[in-house]
Amino acid sequence: MEKFSVHRGVGVPMRRTDVDTDQIIPAVYLKRVTKTGFEDALFAGWRKDPGFVLNQEPYRPGSVLVAGQDFGTGSSREHAVWALRDYGFRAVLAPRFGDIFRGNAGKQGLLAAVVAQSDIDLIWKALEAHPGTEVTVDLIERIVQVDDFTAPFEVDDYVRWRLVEGLDDIGLTLRHADAITDFEARRPSFKPTTTPLAPSA
């Protein structure tokens, strides 16, 4: 997983509240068996509207999504995070997130930063006044900056550490590879084991 310390990218103002995971990625796209390639599925229902924000040229290369209250609510689907990540988003700013979405985001390298609604309103205005404006998200200092405006954001300490270190669940496990190898070497042979996969024909 790519490390995250400071990111600067085009901000995308999404003036919508209660955006659930089915709106982020419709269920029809969940049939895929891969973990990547979901960029076309992101907000698929809304992207049929020519006026949707991601259909506006200045916002298309966006990597910082600025959303309304209760982003990522609804069913638990990691695909919602994958779709945002595959499109190119590194951070989502919102006053509040769905708990499961927020947890999934941190494990997949996407920062879900909690920003006060009053600050979100000011960021929306700045991005709409000058489409294509870049937003700086500083995870080390926990601040977001747009032009001369700076606002703090909240993120769980553990999630912040994982993002800064670039550690997904596999990366965390591999940090203990030596201990795992040592344990397996000392483990009694009469205990159950898993059978290695047979080579494919």
Curated annotation (Swiss-Prot):
It catalyses: (2R,3S)-3-isopropylmalate = (2S)-2-isopropylmalate. Pathway: Amino-acid biosynthesis; L-leucine biosynthesis; L-leucine from 3-methyl-2-oxobutanoate: step 2/4. Belongs to the LeuD family. LeuD type 1 subfamily. Its EC number is 4.2.1.33. One of its GO terms (cellular component) is 3-isopropylmalate dehydratase complex. It comes from Kineococcus radiotolerans (strain ATCC BAA-149 / DSM 14245 / SRS30216). GO terms for biological process: L-leucine biosynthetic process. One of its GO terms (molecular function) is 3-isopropylmalate dehydratase activity. InterPro entries: 3-IsopropMal_deHydase_ssu (IPR004431), Aconitase/3IPM_dehydase_swvl (IPR015928), AconitaseA/IPMdHydase_ssu_swvl (IPR000573), IPMI_Swivel (IPR033940), LeuD (IPR050075). Keywords: Amino-acid biosynthesis, Branched-chain amino acid biosynthesis, Leucine biosynthesis, Lyase. Heterodimer of LeuC and LeuD. Transmembrane segments: none annotated. This is 3-isopropylmalate dehydratase small subunit.
